[in-house]
Amino acid sequence: MRNNRSGKALVLALALCISLLSGCSQPQTKESSESCTPQSGISDISTTESSGFEVKENASVSFLGPEGTYTEEAAKFFFQNTQNFIPKKTVDEAISEVISGNADYAVIPQENTLGGAVTNYIDALIRETEVYVVGEVIIPINQTLMGVEGATLDDIKTVCSHAQGLTQSKAWRSENLPDAAEKEMDSTAAAASFVAESKDKSIAAVAAPGAAELYGLTVLAENVQITDTNRTRFYVLSKTKNPSSGKRAVFIANCEANRLDDIIIDLSGAGFELVTLHDRPDGTKLGSYNYVIEAEAKSISDDMISEITKHDGIRFAGCFDNIEKQP
């Protein structure tokens, strides 16, 4: 048994090494009509964004609201020629707008430099099988502490924000507001709105800088995150597979951990380079997980996708390119 486990570990380690090296030697592959090339029936695509992503004319975009969230900033940066943005209270509601046809796209947080994967939003993506990842936008995150007019740091007894905002500002708060309690909110902008409505000098919010002006709050401290390199990745979702030739694919797998080595070996063999892997318990039994797997290739074909989705319990969830907003 010990030798068998050692052998599996060796195979997995070798596969990871091959995956990391494959970016320098991936084969050229044909474009895929199934995965990353234009789908039949899409005739209303007219606007091309800076990422090469083609956007439906008069597109509507749902996002985690209210106004003033980082998700709104990401959505407006990605969809620079779109005017119809729909703020929703939760990510589930934002995705539901796309599924119901009320929105063409949804933008949801995916991963942060400091807070890691945004697990509840990844869970929402795992649950919904009717949407695909068609784009990604990365923006810098500069968390700001804000309170009502006249408030000072000495007044603050409670700091509210989204869970990610609380995590990203924890070190700063430990040093500057060590006795202040935490209050988790649905979003950073919801926290700013809550503080504004409370008119309470003892409550502050950690939110995007623009939220202070939007909700009439006073900036108490800037850049309260741990590092200036703080970034968040956001997925762009649609009911239709990406009509452009993305170089990154995402798969969602439901399996036990000991099946991962086979999947990773097949990724490398198909010409992919493993980029990220997030795991979430599937709620059925110990040791059984849902995995969100991202992999890159110079181009992506039907055969490459099929090589991965031949495994039971693994599905293709889209391909995309990304754009990044500079600080």
Please place each PLM-identified region on the residue numbering:
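Domain-level signature for soluble enzymes in the chorismate/prephenate branch of the shikimate pathway
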Residues: 2, 10-14, 18-327
